[in-house]
Regions:
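Detector for glycine-centered tight turns/loop "hinges" at secondary-structure junctions
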Residues: 8, 42, 59, 108-110
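Low-complexity, acidic Ser/Thr/Pro/Gly-rich terminal tails and inter-domain linkers that flank the onset
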Residues: 1-28
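Short, solvent-exposed loop/turn segments enriched in Ser/Thr/Gly
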Residues: 28-34, 98
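Terminal connector regions
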Residues: 2-4, 89-127
C-alpha cells in the first residue's frame, strides 16, 4: 500500500451559528463547529495537537494552537471515527476557519490531518 494511504485521517467540519450567545449590536458572533475524524488509513494514529486559523470578514486573523481537542487526544484505529464540538467568536457576521491536526501513528510517524476552509455565517447572509 502507498505510504500516503497508510497515514490518512479525514477531518470534516459542520459549522453552526449560535444566536443566543451572539450579540450583533456589539459585534459578537458566536459559532459552534463539529469536527468528525475518520481513520481511512491502515495504521492506528493519535491526535496530538491542533492549529486553527480563524479569519473574520475584515480579514483579521486569530490563530489557535493547543494540545488535543476538548481536552482529549483520541487514538483512532483504522475505520474508527471521533467527533467533537467546540466554538469560536468573531466580530463580523461572516468569516472562515481552517485547521490542521498533528497526528502520530502507532509506528511513530507524524503526519497532519487537515480540515479544509469552511465558512462561518449567520443565517440568510450568504446566498
Amino acid at each position: 500500500m502507498a505510504e500516503s494511504k497508510k497515514y490518512q485521517i479525514e477531518a470534516r467540519a459542520v459549522p453552526q451559528f449560535i444566536a443566543d450567545q451572539s450579540d450583533p449590536a456589539n459585534e459578537r458572533y458566536v459559532f459552534a463547529y463539529t469536527i468528525r475524524f475518520e481513520n481511512v488509513g491502515t495504521v492506528p494514529a493519535q491526535l496530538i495537537s491542533r492549529h486553527w486559523v480563524i479569519t473574520d470578514g475584515k480579514a483579521r486573523v486569530q490563530e489557535v494552537r493547543g494540545l488535543g481537542v476538548v481536552g482529549q487526544q483520541p487514538l483512532l484505529k483504522p475505520g474508527e471515527t471521533f467527533e467533537y464540538t467546540s466554538g469560536c467568536q468573531i466580530d463580523t457576521p461572516v468569516g472562515t476557519m481552517r485547521g490542521s491536526f498533528q497526528m502520530t501513528a502507532e509506528d511513530g510517524t507524524q503526519f497532519e490531518a487537515v480540515t479544509g476552509e469552511f465558512t462561518l455565517s449567520i443565517p440568510r447572509v450568504l446566498h
